[in-house]
Each structure stands twice: as structure tokens, then as C-alpha cells.
A protein has these predicted regions:
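N-terminal "arm"/small-domain region of PLP-dependent enzymes with the aminotransferase-like
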Residues: 2-90, 94-97, 101, 302, ...
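Conserved core segment of the aminotransferase class I/II
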Residues: 5-7, 94, 253-332
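Short beta-strand
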Residues: 44-46, 84, 262, 359-364, ...
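Short catalytic/ligand-binding loop motif for oxyanion handling, primarily in non-cytosolic enzymes
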Residues: 53-58, 203-204, 270-271
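Conserved core of the PLP fold type I
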Residues: 69-224, 234-236, 242-254, 374-375, ...
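Conserved PLP-binding catalytic core of the aspartate aminotransferase-like
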Residues: 328-385
Length: 427
């Protein structure tokens, strides 16, 4: 039905077509960042968002990245043309080789890869692809997991039931491996997807041992579960990119499991705002790889058309040059090393204060985060001390430095004593 200009309905604030919508909750991490920014206190600490900070509490552009940016800027051949739908070819190959360890030609023929909008885009693309191609009834997600995992699967795979497998043991601040395996053994069904953190688990900082990874792979084979790895922190757990890729490579090397991996370069290259990522699928044969990749490219075209080029150029430039790659690996060691130093410093300060509870888990955990064991009540009390972390107790350790670690430890000591509730017992 058509309208004349005079007959067009006028929508005011009171009768908008969108007034039926409920206001969605804001993201808690970015909300906390806003609270921190508004806090007028001179002494304060933000342990919220998962970004690396240097000893001065400032963003750190990796020296290798700075060097390559200058080289790209001075290259007269640099342009801003569209990339292919699957992304910058040399980047996609470099990302694949970094993750899978320079795979053999026979393995390469079974790996399909394309560039994505960082790790979030890779998880989204994978969720949508698996929803459309495999129609799984359930996806198993660790309890807890990165909060955005839930939202991504809600949007990209709304008909897939999200189930939680036990992961964190609050009594010991350690991995509940027995509970995890028992739940998956008894309740997971053939065809279910299982989401696994490749290393530096977010938010707990607790990873399975290699022997435990082998048992998880055995279970996936036995139960016919489909592994979906999220690799957001390669190089941040141990400081060694090969060591941190061990779980993914072990699953692949068994030769019995098809799987997918979402890969992010935000953390290990410090390219948070450039949104550099990749998605990989490992199939049982080359024909299946080609078919799956064609569907992934089809989805990519409909959603973003082409991924952005700048950050991908930086990563590819570094990974394709042995000298630059070696320099970047040193940058990684600096970042992971400082985080480990800050873990030890916080633990040492709490020990010196004789803060009630066992805090050994802070140094036992790895990667960017610590699941401190602090309760929501204690976390909220910390905000009055101008210390900001998530209500789950997750703390971004890179937010600590030599100037604020004593203040943070004293604040934790204060709220723990005031609450009379020690957050952890001896493991």
C-alpha cells in the first residue's frame, strides 16, 4: 500500500515502532572502564580489560610492530585496495603456520583458513558455520568462560543449546578436571560441539596439563564430540608460541578429529584496535576442506565482504621475515615475563601482609588473567578503595605495576579481613 507525502505516518518518541524493545544490558568490562575513568582518585588501579600495559600503566606498541609500520608506510607499493574475501593470502598462510607449526603438505591440504575480524569475528563465523552445516543440538562451554562466548552463540547459533561443563573449583582455585570429564562423559552426546580454550584460559588462567589434554582428546574421539578451539593468547601463557599451541596440534596430529579454531592476534601483537584474526577448519580430506571453505567464504561475503588489510599486513610482514619474527618473539617474552613478575609481586605482597587465605593460585595460573577467588561482595568493596576488577573476581594482571601493586595488595587485605571470608583454601 502506498502513501501520499501527507499520509505518511509520523513516529514520535511515544509511538516509535521500536518502543517494544527492552534495553539490553551494557558490557560489564567496558562499563567498568568507564567507572574507572570517572574516578577522581589519584591512586587507583584498573584490572578490568584484557589488554597489556607497560610498567607505566600505558598501552605498549610492540617495537617490532613500530618498525614494520614504518616500513609499510615507506613502501611505495602499499595501497588500500580490497582484499579477497578470504583475506590477505600471505597473512592467512602465516597465521595457519603459526598455529599448526608449519604443517606438512598432506595436512595443509586438509586445513581451510580465512582472515576474520579478530577472535570475536572468528568465533562468530565458526558458530554460524557449524550451526548451518552440522546443526548440532548442543555446545559445551566451560564454566566459567569468556562472557562474549554466550552472546555470540545466542546470536549466531540461536537454536543450539548452550551447556556448561565444570571447569573451575572455587574451593581450591584450580581446575575441576574430574568434574569436567565426568559431566562430558555422562551427558555429552555424539555430534555435540565442545568449546575449548587453547591456552591461558579466560577468565581463570588455568589450563589442563598435557596429560589432561590427551584425556580430553580421547573423550572427544570416544564420544564423537566436535572440538572448537578459541586461541586468543598464543604466546601469553608460556611466552613460547609453540608451547601454547600444543593442545591444538595434539588434537590435529591424532588424525582422527575434525575441528575448527578461532585465532586472534589482538594480544600477542598488541593490535587490539586493528581486529586481526583468522578462522581455521581441519577436515578429514581435501574435498571436504574445499567444500567447507566455500561455505565460509560465502558467509564472509554476506557479513563483511572483505576483512581489513592494515593489521594483517603487519602480522604477515613479521611472520614472513625470520629476523623480525625473532624480534617479535622477544617482545612476547617481555610481555609474558612482566605479567609473571606481577603475579609473583602480588602474591609476595599478600604473603607479607599475612592476608587470610591461600593465594598460591595467583602464581599457579597463567596468561593475562587471574581468577582471584574474591567474592562479588569483596570486589564491590574494592571499588571503594579505587581498585576495579570484574565481579567474578577476574583480574587483568597486566594492570599491575611496581607503583600500584602494594596499594592493590593492601586493598585486597583490607576487604578480605573486613568480610571475614578468605577466598581460597589450600589446594
Amino acid at each position: 500500500m502506498g502513501y501520499t507525502r501527507e499520509e505518511l505516518p509520523v513516529h514520535t518518541k511515544s509511538n516509535s515502532l521500536f518502543n517494544h524493545l527492552e534495553t539490553m544490558p551494557g558490557d560489564p568490562i567496558f562499563g567498568l572502564m568507564s567507572l574507572y575513568a570517572k574516578d577522581p582518585a589519584e591512586e587507583k588501579a584498573s584490572l578490568t580489560i584484557g589488554v597489556y600495559r607497560d610498567e607505566e600503566g600505558k598501552p605498549w606498541v610492540l617495537p617490532t610492530v613500530k618498525k614494520v609500520e614504518k616500513m609499510i608506510a615507506e613502501d611505495v607499493a602499499t595501497n588500500h585496495e580490497y582484499l579477497p574475501m578470504e583475506g590477505l593470502h600471505v597473512f592467512v598462510e602465516s597465521a595457519r603456520d603459526l598455529l599448526f607449526g608449519n604443517p606438512s603438505p598432506s595436512l595443509t591440504s586438509r586445513i581451510g583458513s580465512l582472515q576474520t575480524i579478530s577472535g570475536t569475528g572468528a568465533v562468530h563465523l565458526g558458530a554460524r558455520f557449524l550451526n548451518d552445516s552440522l546443526s548440532p543440538k548442543r555446545i559445551w562451554v566451560s564454566d566459567p568462560t569468556w562472557g562474549n562466548h554466550h552472546a555470540i552463540f545466542d546470536i549466531a547459533a540461536p537454536n543450539v543449546e548452550q551447556k556448561m561443563y565444570p571447569y573451575y573449583d572455587a574451593a581450591t582455585c584450580s581446575l575441576n578436571f574430574t568434574g569436567m570429564m565426568k559431566t562430558l562423559e555422562n551427558e555429552a552426546q555424539p555430534g555435540d560441539v565442545i568449546l575449548l580454550h587453547a591456552c591461558a584460559h579466560n577468565p581463570t588462567g588455568i589450563d589442563p596439563t598435557k596429560e589432561q589434554w590427551k584425556q580430553i582428546a580421547d573423550l572427544c574421539e570416544r564420544k564423537h564430540l566436535f572440538p572448537f578451539f578459541d586461541s586468543a593468547y598464543q604466546g601469553f601463557a608460556s611466552g613460547d608460541v609453540d608451547e601454547d599451541a600444543w593442545a591444538v596440534r595434539h588434537f590435529v596430529e591424532r588424525g582422527t578429529l575434525e575441528l575448527v579454531v578461532a585465532q586472534s592476534f589482538s594480544k600477542n601483537f598488541g593490535l587490539y584496535g586493528q581486529r586481526v584474526g583468522a578462522f581455521h577448519i581441519v577436515t578429514s580430506d581435501e574435498q571436504a576442506r574445499d567444500k567447507a571453505l566455500s561455505h565460509l567464504i560465502y558467509l564472509q561475503r554476506a557479513e563483511i565482504s572483505n576483512p581489513p588489510v592494515y593489521g594483517a599486513r603487519i602480522v604477515a610482514f613479521i611472520l614472513q621475515n625470520e629476523e623480525l619474527k625473532a624480534e617479535w618473539e622477544q617482545d612476547l617474552l617481555i610481555m609474558s615475563g612482566r605479567i609473571k613478575t606481577m603475579r609473583a609481586a602480588l602474591f609476595g605482597e599478600l604473603q607479607a601482609l599475612e592476608t587470610p587465605g591461600n593465594w598460591q593460585h595467583i602464581v599457579n595460573q597463567n596468561g593475562m588473567f587471574s581468577y582471584t577467588g574474591l567474592s562479588e561482595k569483596q570486589v564491590l568493596a574494592l571499588r571503594k578503595e579505587h581498585i576495579y576488577l570484574l565481579t567474578s573476581g577476574r583480574a587483568s594482571i597486566s594492570g599491575l605495576n611496581r607503583d600500584n601493586v602494594k596499594m592493590v595488595a593492601k586493598a585486597i587485605d583490607k576487604v578480605v579481613r573486613a568480610s571475614g571470608d578468605a577466598p581460597a583454601v589450600a589446594a
